[in-house]
Amino acid sequence: MKELAAELRKYKQVFVVCDRNVEGFAREVTGLRTDGRSGEPGGLLAITADEAHKTIDTVMQICRWLLEMGADREALVLAVGGGVTTDMAGFAASIYKRGIRYANVPTTLLSMVDAGIGGKTGVNLDGFKNLLGVIRQPEFTAIFPEALQTLPEKEFRSGLAEMLKTFIIKNPSHAYERTVAEGPLPELIQMAAGIKQEIVEKDEFEAGMRRKLNLGHTWGHAIEWRLPGAYSHGEAVAIGMVQAARYAERFGIAEEEGLAARIGKDLKACGLPTELPCPVSELLPAIAKDKKAQNGQIRLVLPVRIGKVVVKKVDPSTL
């Protein structure tokens, strides 16, 4: 926490936007003051950070608060919370006064290994996931593993799914197998975050290899649209990863025999769902609107073995 305090002192104004569920933690890690003293947080806004509130209205609430608080273009917005919080606070910072700086203090496993890294910010539009947003890199991301001690089990599993996704894409030192067997050890969390950061640095605007990070998300986002609130993001992505592996086998590109069965078994062992909760036909409207779609085709990220995925263009009607 001393390192974070030292980092914050570099900024003239710091405004904290946090998930109301972690307001106490946000005050603790920032040493929040309200006297406007240089280098100290100038105020805190606690928001409802769930998918139902991940909208442009909440982003406008944040922007209006920044305006009322007198935030200028030298200010820093510090997002403290999970992926919904970092997405919305980052988006607000990206458009307020044509862009001010922001940083992340992720408090969920998912945001530590995925959402809090890489600069993707945004909100949902009419229930469709992340259709509004920009890519803007945070000044820094500060990870405090102790924040996970009070994380609800459902959210813990959600982040575990994203960790496993990362290691299906790239699997150094058998990180995938270790995560299944031992859980998200701090060194594995750092490894997953490092893999994502490495990919982002090579392809910030998702023109190529960064698309691989969308493994499981084509079906996952569609499930979240079709059954809002029924599954956490990570749970929906887990189902999507099994579907992706099945399609890799169907297209004859899987290099590992029984890949889909293996991934399904491992995800189940981690307490994650693996089967579609509805017919694919009910998911097609969302799949067709997927932000990766282009010229009537979607880009599916398909695992061919643990540690390797490919991107394949397909017609949604073939799913």
What are these regions (language model features)?
Residues 68-71, 137-153, 161-169, 173, ...:
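Generic secondary-structure signature for well-ordered alpha-helical cores
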Residues 15, 161-163, 254-319:
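C-terminal charged capping/lid subdomain of soluble metabolic enzymes
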Residues 1-76:
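ATP/NTP phosphate-donor binding region
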Residues 91-180:
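A glycine/threonine-rich phosphate-anchoring loop and its flanking beta-alpha core
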